[in-house]
Amino acid sequence: MKIELRRARQEDREKVIEVESGATPNLSYLANVFDMFLSEKSGEFIVAEVDGKLVGCGKFTKMPDGSAWLEALRVLPEYQGMGIGKCFYKQFFDIARHRDVTTMRMYTGVKNAVSKGLADQFGFNVSAAYRGAWLPCPQEAGRDSTDTFRQVTDPDRATAILMPFFEKWTGFLVMNRTFFALKPALCLSLAQKGCIYEDPRSRSVITLGARFMPEQALHIGVFGGDTEACLEFAAKEGATKCTKRLSCLFPPSAVDLQDILTHNDFRFEASDFIVMTVHC
């Protein structure tokens, strides 16, 4: 059996979608992000072939803070357990060395022993746990009581109002199940993308955005202050943008956040997620 890894090409699209359909039938999004993954200069989209057959894929993405995010690692079920996942990880470490990346991260479900076990073998350690919550967006924007929220585009102001969330949110801000390290570099990036909102009157702050597929979900990264006003504003933005749902990943240790989300009729994912880190 000959395993070869190479960069993905446009003509791999259908095969990559087939791999995802077989490997993770309950988590399918590569059809929507294939072109983005292929064109991103901040990362490398890789496929695995066994004796010339495309059987796996994986993505290495450089993050705003200079770390790397490992994602979309998929292998056809009939080819799992043959060392293909290990080949991807070895390739990720090679890319990291070539790109001067010293920290890599990935996420998985707390019940996914195989995914965690593979990361364990390569020195990854659990950094934090997160719980997912979601709420269908209203079809129409609500009342105008949240019109005092304004976008924050100044990097210094963005850093000043977001970094205090670091401890409570255990160091990460999550969008599209991508765990961004909450650092000044991320604050700058979010400010540039128009994802930060502040209501100076009530000292409320919320981040809203999507790394991809904004029509599917508007992601709440962090929020605080008048939490009811924050969530009302998020619902209004979701309706305005015609997105299907609001999504929020938060630390289970923040019991007050779960209470707030529960009170606002959010539904919770069946199991939690973990983010794992390695320094290389």
Task: Give the label of every model feature segment.
Residues 13, 20-59, 164-201:
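Active-site rim helix/loop that mediates acceptor-substrate recognition in acyltransferases
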Residues 47, 53-61, 69, 74, ...:
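Conserved beta-strand in the GNAT
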Residues 62, 105-108, 125-139, 265-279:
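Conserved catalytic-core motifs of GNAT/GCN5-like acyltransferases
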Residues 62-70, 80, 208-221, 268-272:
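A conserved beta-turn-beta hairpin within the catalytic core of GNAT-like acetyltransferases
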Residues 68, 95-111, 241-251:
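Conserved GNAT acetyl-CoA-binding A-motif
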Residues 75-77, 81-95, 117, 121, ...:
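Conserved acetyl-CoA-binding loop-helix of GNAT-fold acetyltransferases
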Residues 82, 86, 98, 110-128, ...:
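Conserved active-site alpha-helix within GNAT-family acetyltransferase domains
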Residues 122-214:
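Amide-forming acyltransferase catalytic core, primarily the GNAT-like/NAT-type
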